[in-house]
Swiss-Prot record:
Residues 480-489 have a biased composition (Polar residues). Residues 464-519, 776-795, 958-1042 are annotated as: Disordered. Keywords: Chromosome, Coiled coil, DNA damage, DNA repair, DNA replication, Nucleus, Transcription, Transcription regulation. GO terms for biological process: constitutive heterochromatin formation; DNA repair; DNA-templated DNA replication; nucleosome assembly; positive regulation of RNA polymerase II transcription preinitiation complex assembly; regulation of sister chromatid cohesion; transcription elongation by RNA polymerase II. The keyword Signal does not apply. This is FACT complex subunit spt16. The gene is spt16. GO terms for molecular function: histone binding; histone chaperone activity; nucleosome binding. Residues 973-984 have a biased composition (Low complexity). Forms a stable heterodimer with pob3. The spt16-pob3 dimer weakly associates with multiple molecules of nhp6 to form the FACT complex. SMART domains: FACT-Spt16_Nlob (SM01285), Rtt106 (SM01287), SPT16 (SM01286).
Length: 1042
């Protein structure tokens, strides 16, 4: 069936306008991008499958959405000329007949280009036919336009264009080559047209990436593992042909949960590969092909690229089958390199920095692998599979911009396996390739669904599978050991269980030393070859703003030559020298009005460098060496008018700041994929649950449903709902109602979502565990009851109902985990027995550890700290005489502010230390509260230098220096049992005084003193009692010490 040719007119003019704007703006010295060209020539010949995606047809797809063979485009800075054929004829003799029959709409190119006339940018279409004279006239007009536009003309010298139409143009153009200078325009097309993608382009690349991920994880991995497990023989070429055929299986792609419902499998095609390699022969270049060797265990490399609506995505993975220790170590290092590169894929990064940081890490950590590391860490990707002008090597000075798409590749080639005795596995290569979008603050990895972690890529078909099991058992043993601990609380500090098992304490101290050493080493490896932020603060970037593009956009009121506040354009227009001068609100600091005599004065202060040393002194400017206007003062007799203007400017400034703040708050909110509802059956539901944070309106219970790729909370009012996708779930918790008023299921998200007008990372579904109680005293039932039978029955019923609630919610949480198991969703339950109270926000709450986190889920604001994100914990205010201490968590992401849990009772100190040690978190302690803002600025400013100077050891050093004094102080003031008994007797005697005792004591102090035993007598009694109990002085001293 013929394809209906419809050119998106809006997209055409938007893209052409942005291209022309970039062209006109390129007036820097040396004309770095466009090379000072006055015109650009894009020539398309006949369709050529071998050169299907070059810059010339990429320009066709970018502007028109289609490739039109035998077409010439000539651009000047204000107009576009198109020379094309009217119908199929001698100009298309070598064009593939199947292509033309499938796209009969292409036979009349002029017809489809005709609607582009009359737009905001002039487009002239010159139609040619079989008549040579007519074609010559069209070419002559284009040549005249090129000569008039300037000496330099942009061409694509590396692109090939064949066929009669192309040959005719080349002959015609040869006549003016002596009059013009040809400039390679491909870098300009890359930067101004293809690099930064709009929304439609990003959606196409994302869908292509999801198709790649699905084909890799849902098909190739299953096929590969089945062949190896069943020990079947198959060549790389045969396996790649199987994958090749799978692209025509529309049902397979329809089943992939990540692909949207509107995804059209008919629009996908291969961009590269598929390529499968194993058995010691590897080629990591894009030109590689699958050979006829058999698939072998060891290192298996698989890669391919898929094109959707002409936009490409690429993926490559390395699979380790029964790997050696050195192979596992090198792959783990490759993951470290991958994270290092990904961390800097963000707006404003220089392209060469990505490669330089990766190679710097190789040189610092494994210099023997430097010669094996790939020559670049990726390239630009889009319509072209690999943009040669955006290769991420050590020489590319281009700046990454938000909206760019890149293929990021880290790899090791031809590494020798010293442990191998088999020549087929003596040499191996490894590669990880992902397609990513450059974001404001980091990358969006489109191909992340095909896992790259060790668990996802490792396969053990031999005897090496067994040793992996103890890891999980070890974790459970630690948790069980902790839950058996019982803390006794007493009234007096002297009676608290301050004694610690010396053997356990020594083991814990030794373990903490190992963790501290490990942290320092990890820090040096992680930040090798990196540079920190200046002064520990990420520098702000200047954001351009514009009040009006043209004079005719100015408001009509400017003719009155009065001060005018244009709220729509966020601009203040001031008449200067008889002309209206606009000042954008972003340039204004504040405005104030004052009176002096019969005049009112309006003073407008502008932002400029060096205005002070306050918090806002880091205001960025485009050129700080330029001349700046500091302030402007206007005088008028119209007092009310100036007062109104000052108020309007103040309001405008407030609104601008509020909008900026709202935009900043919403930066990390990403648009979720659509929830795929279950249609063929009723979804599993949990009724009568409340939502936190709640939806706007009346508080009423709703129900939670489990669908194919997420949860949906349905409100009974106004058909409102909240969707939570499994792919966005970081933690899933179930907390029973024991000792609580509610039973709950809590979801902690990777990226925040919007619920109503609130941004949140935590979504909670709960039901109250208690019912209203009624006093039945005096009613008819009560008359026939004796004793506490009724109260006993109510308690029994309460226990039964709570147990039923726990069973219902736990079963539903397990069903959620089962539905989301492909996304790694698992249920976690807090350990109440090892919980401790503290103040993470405003109120004192119970904080409970889980297997993977530390949580407080009972009352908002919630606390969820992921354990593997913690760098170190520090215990503050640990000193004798204080009833509580504070706990500070520092995260591996040093830009993330530390989390404080304050006012933890000192009785919990040993329990907290035991728990931290059991989950392998390094901790230190000290007597004072530290200024963590200053500390983290120091760390961020030079992280490598920080770890080189000892890292977090300064916290431990502070603890050690205070430890001796603390012990002495405690042992000096702590009472022995005999002294405490004597003190208690004295207290009892004091309590027998009458109301006038205080007055008598003040009048006759000496008599009161003589009436009791002195301290020497008490000391003698205490020693005698100790001797009787068999304790000498040394043992008693040990007992008193902590």
């Amino acid at each position: 069936m013929a394809e209906e040719i419809v050119i998106d007119k809006s997209a055409f003019f938007n893209r052409l306008s942005s291209f022309f704007a970039a062209w006109k703006a390129d007036k820097r010295p040396g004309h770095a991008v466009f090379g000072g060209v006055g015109s650009i020539v894009i020539l398309m010949g006949k369709t050529d499958e071998a050169n299907s995606f070059q810059k010339n047809n990429a320009m066709h797809f970018w502007l028109l959405g289609y490739e039109f063979p035998a077409t010439l485009m000539v651009f000047t800075t204000d107009m576009m000329y198109v020379v094309t054929t009217a119908k199929k004829g001698e100009d298309w003799p070598n064009t593939d007949s199947a292509y033309l029959s499938a796209n009969t709409g292409l036979l009349n190119v002029a017809k489809h280009l005709e609607p582009l006339k009359g737009g905001k940018i002039p487009v002239e279409i010159l139609v040619t036919s079989k008549d040579p004279d007519e074609k010559s006239r069209s070419f002559e007009k284009c040549l005249e336009v090129i000569k008039n536009a300037g000496k330099r003309v942009g061409v694509l010298p590396k692109d090939t264009a064949a066929g009669p139409f192309a040959e005719d143009w080349k002959r015609a153009f040869a006549n003016i080559t002596q009059d013009v200078e040809e400039v390679d325009i491909s870098p300009a097309l890359s930067s101004a047209a293809f690099s930064v993608k709009d929304t439609d382009e990003l959606v196409a690349i994302r869908n292509a990436s999801r198709a790649c991920s699905g084909l890799m994880s849902e098909y190739f991995v299953d096929e590969m593992s089945r062949l190896l497990d069943e020990e079947k023989q198959m060549t790389h070429k045969a396996l790649s042909m199987r994958i090749d055929a799978k692209i025509d299986d529309a049902k397979f792609f329809k089943k992939l949960a990540k692909l949207p419902a509107e995804f059209d499998p008919q629009q996908i095609d291969w961009a590269y590969g598929p390529v499968i390699q194993s058995g010691g022969k590897y080629d990591l270049r894009l030109t590689a092909t699958s050979d006829n060797s058999h698939l072998q265990a060891g290192i298996i490399v698989a890669g391919f690229g898929i094109r959707y609506k002409t936009y490409s995505s690429i993926i490559a993975r390395t699979y380790l089958v029964d790997p050696s220790k050195s192979q596992e170590a090198n792959y783990a290092f490759l993951l470290n390199l991958h994270d290092t590169v990904m961390k800097d894929v963000r707006d404003g990064t220089m392209a060469k920095d990505l490669f330089n940081k990766a190679i710097g890490l190789v040189r610092a950590k494994k210099p023997e692998l430097e010669s094996h590391f790939v020559k670049s860490v990726g390239a630009g990707i889009g319509i072209e599979l690999r943009d040669s002008n955006m290769v991420l090597n050590g020489k590319n000075n281009k700046i990454l911009k938000s909206g760019m798409t890149l293929s990021i590749t880290v790899g090791l080639t031809d590494v020798e396996e010293l442990e191998s005795k088999d020549k087929n596995t003596a040499v191996y290569s490894m590669i990880i390739t992902d397609t990513v979008r450059v974001g404001e603050n980091g990358p969006h990895i489109f191909t992340k669904d095909a896992g790259i972690d060790m668990d996802s890529v490792s396969f053990y078909f031999g005897d090496e599978e067994e040793p992996q099991k103890p890891a999980k058992e070890k974790k459970e043993v630690k948790s069980n050991a902790m839950t058996s601990r019982n803390v006794t609380r007493t009234k007096l500090r002297a009676e608290r269980p301050t004694q610690v098992n010396e053997g356990a304490e020594a083991r814990r101290r030794e373990h903490q030393k190992e963790l501290a050493t490990k942290k320092t080493k990890e820090g040096l490896d992680r930040f090798a070859g990196t540079t920190g932020d200046d002064n520990g603060v990420t520098q702000k970037k200047f954001k351009r703003f514009e009040s009006y593009k043209r004079d005719n956009q100015l408001p009509t009121k400017v003719k009155d030559l009065t001060i005018y506040v244009d709220h729509k354009a966020s601009t203040v227009i001031v008449p200067i020298m008889g002309r209206p001068v606009p000042f954008h609100i972003n340039t204004i600091k504040n405005a104030s009005k004052s009176d002096e005599g019969e005049y009112a004065y309006l003073r407008i202060n502008f932002l400029s460098p060096g205005q002070g040393v306050g918090r806002k002194d880091d205001q960025p400017f485009e050129d700080i060496s330029a001349h700046f206007l500091r302030n402007l003062t206007l005088r008028s007799k119209d007092n009310e008018r100036l007062a109104q203007v000052a108020q309007d400017i103040t309001e405008l400034r407030k609104n601008a700041l509020r909008r900026e703040q709202e935009k900043k708050e919403m930066e990390d909110v990403v648009e979720q994929d659509k929830l795929v509802e279950i249609r063929n059956r009723r979804p599993v539901r949990l009724p009568d649950v409340y939502l936190r944070p709640p939806l706007d309106g009346k508080r009423v219970p709703g129900e939670v449903e489990i669908h194919q790729n997420g949860l949906r909370y349905m409100s009974p009012f106004r058909n409102e709902h909240v969707d939570v996708l499994f792919s966005n779930v970081k933690h899933l918790f179930f907390q029973p109602c024991a000792h609580e008023l509610i039973v709950l299921i809590h979801v902690h998200l990777k990226t925040p979502i919007m619920i109503g007008k609130r941004k949140t990372r935590d979504v909670q579904f709960y039901r109250e565990a208690t019912e209203m109680q009624f006093d039945e005293t005096g009613n008819r039932r009560r008359k026939h009851r004796y004793g506490d039978e009724e109260e006993f029955e109510a308690e029994q019923e309460e226990r039964r109902r709570r147990a039923a609630l726990d069973r219902e919610f736990k079963a539903f949480a397990e069903k959620i985990a089962d539905a989301g198991k492909d996304e790694g969703v698992d249920v976690d339950i807090p350990f109440r027995e090892i919980g401790f109270t503290g103040v993470p926000n405003r109120s004192n709450v119970l904080i409970q550890p889980t297997t993977d986190a530390l949580v407080q889920l009972t009352e908002p604001p919630f606390l969820v700290i992921t354990l593997n994100e913690i760098e170190i914990a520090h215990l503050e205010r640990v000193q004798f005489g204080l009833k509580n201490f504070d706990l500070v968590f520092v995260f591996k992401d040093f830009h993330r502010p530390p989390v404080h849990v304050n006012t933890i009772p000192v009785e919990s100190l040993e329990g907290v230390k035991d728990w931290l040690d059991s989950v392998d978190i390094a901790f230190t302690e000290g007597p004072l509260n530290l200024n963590w803002t200053t500390i983290m600025k120091t760390v961020v400013s030079d992280p490598y230098g920080f770890f080189a100077d000892g890292g977090w050891s300064f916290l431990a050093a502070e603890s050690d220096s205070e430890g001796g004094a603390s012990d002495e102080e405690e042992s000096a003031f702590e009472l022995s049992e005999s002294e405490l008994a004597a003190a208690d007797e004295s207290s009892e005697d004091d309590s027998e005084f009458d109301d006038d005792a205080s007055a008598e004591a003040s009048e006759d102090f000496s008599a009161d003193e003589d009436s009791g035993e002195d301290w020497d007598e008490l000391e003698r009694k205490a020693k005698k009692k100790d001797r009787e109990s068999g304790l000498d002085d040394e043992e008693r001293g040990k007992k008193r010490k902590r």
